Amino acid sequence: MKEYVRTKANSMKKINDLALPGEIVIFGSTYMSEFPIYELINKCKSENAVYNRSVKGLTVKEAIEILDDCVVDIHPNKVFISLGEEDESNPNAFSEYVDLVSAIRQKLPEAVIILIGLMNGSSFAESFNKSMLSLCDNKKVKYVELVKKGPSENALFKAQCKQISSFFRTNPITMGDAFELTGL
């Protein structure tokens, strides 16, 4: 494991006692570590606390090693996984991903897991995303493929924020919320 990853996981572990159980964790690699999560939370007035436990450069294998410290120990009810982007050269990446999802299901049986598809559009990403779908039951394990292009980086983040925030809800969506999400 890279020293940076272990250091970051240790830092997160130290603040676990500040986290509220039953909330949302985003567990990812480089893309999600740089994603404007807190702007999203403020914009959508999330009903839940959201903890970004993403680490730049995190591989799936490393994610398994730090899973308890970064995710399980705060007992979330939803876990977004955005991993695989650092694993293109790893022939075991998807089997490790299966192990990760299985570990979360075993350790957090009530949690809903949302798998976020890889963004880069490579043949590896396309294959990996298709394989991710095989893990979904649309009850406890769901899949979302985020918008990959926009007229600007700001517009792209806004579109992705709308997609992700729809999973943040615990209460049924109202007609007003639906119009707001679609931009009408």
Model segments located where?
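Alpha-helical cap/lid subdomain in secreted, periplasmic
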Residues: 43-45, 65-184
